[in-house]
Amino acid sequence: MQRRDAAALRRLLTQHAEFRPFINAPFFPFNAPALVACAGDAAMVEVLLEVGADPNKRSEWWAGGFHPLHVATGVAAERLLAAGAVADACAAAHLDKPELLASLLAADASRVRERGGDGQTPLHFARSRRVIDLLLDAGADLDARDVDHRATAAEWMLDRSRGAGRYDLAQYLVERGASADIMLASALGRTDDVVAMLRRDPALLDEQTGRGRYAEMPPSSYHIYFWTIGSSRSPMDVAAQFGHDDTLAAMLPFATPVQRLRFACRRGDAERARALLRDEPGLVASLAPNDHRAVTDAAWNGDAAAVALMLELGFDPAMPGHDAGTALHCAAWQGSVASVAAILGYPAGRALLTTRDAHHGGTPLGWCCHGSLHGPAGGEHAGIARLLLAAGAAMEEGDASDEVEEVLMEWREGHR
C-alpha cells in the first residue's frame, strides 16, 4: 500500500483471501479504509474494487470523513463513479463537475453548507471559478472554516509558492469578498491590506504559522497554513516566499530590529544580519528565549544556510521546536546532512547528542531513524546516522529504513 504497488497488492489479496474481510476497515492514516488511502492511484483503485472495496466507504475521521471521491481525480474518479460511488456536493466541487453540483443543490439547497473530509465545505473543494460562482450564488459562506484545521477555503488553496496549487482561486475568493488575515494577504501580495493591518497592530509581524492562533488546538490540528505555507513562517517570510517584494518592502518600516534579524537569518542573508549587528552589537544577547527557536525552526525546514548563519551569530540550538526537538533532532529527522554537520561543528550542538526531547523521549539518532521512514523523500538519513554515531551518539533501538539499518549494523559490528 505504501509503495502503491498494485501488482503486489493483487498478488497478496489473491494468495491471502483472509485479508479481504478487512478491506473496508479503517486501518490507514486518519482512520481511512484502503480505498480512501489510495484513491488518487487508478491502478490501486482497480485492485481494491476487484476484491470488494466499498466505493462509498468514508474515513472515520472525527472532524469529517473523506469519501473516496473527495480524494480521487481523473481516471481513478471515473472508475469509482462507474463502480457506484455517489458524489456529494463536496465531491462534485472537487471533481469540478458544475452540472452535477447544480443538480444536487437544486434538489437540496442546504447542501451548499454540507461538510466533507476534515469538515470542509464544498467551497473548500472548489477547483474552478465556475464552481465557486455556483456555490456563492447558492449562498455559500466565503469565510466558513473547516473543523480540523480552522481555515477558510482561500487559506486551503495555497501551496507554498506563488501560482502553485489553487493560488488563482484564492485570489478570486478574496476579490469576491473573502477575508484575508496577515498571512493570506502576504501570500497574495495584497500590499494595501497588509499595511492597513500593520498600522492597526504592528505586532502582527511576530505571528508565525504553526504557533499562537495557528497552533494545534486539540482536538483540532494545526491551522492549514502549516501545510499550505509551511511551519514557523512570519508574514515577512511569507511575502518573500511567495515572491512579493513590494509587499515585503512595505512591511519593513514596521519591523523591529529583532524581527529584521530573524528575517535576515531565516533568509540566510549573512550580509544583512551582520550589518544589523554592527548597528546594534547587543542584539543577539537581547533575544528572548523564544527568539532563539528560529535556528531550530530552520533546522526543521532543512535550511542549512540559515542554520549555519544563526549558529555563527550565537543562536542557541538547544531551544525546543517542533515536537520539543532541538535543532539537532529536527535536522536529523528532516534528513539534512548539511544542517546536522553545521550543528555538530559547535560544542553547543554536540552537547545535544544525548538529549531526549520532552514529547517523544527520543535522541537525535532516534529522530533520524524515524525520519528515515516517515520524513521527507530524498532525505540523507544514512549519512546523518554516520555523522551522529561518529560524533558520539549512543546506539538507538527502533525501526529505520534499510539504508539506516545498514549503517547501524556496520557500527555495531565495528564496535563490539
Language-model segments: residues:
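Ankyrin-repeat boundary/"N-cap" motif
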Residues: 21-39, 58-71, 86-93, 113-127, ...
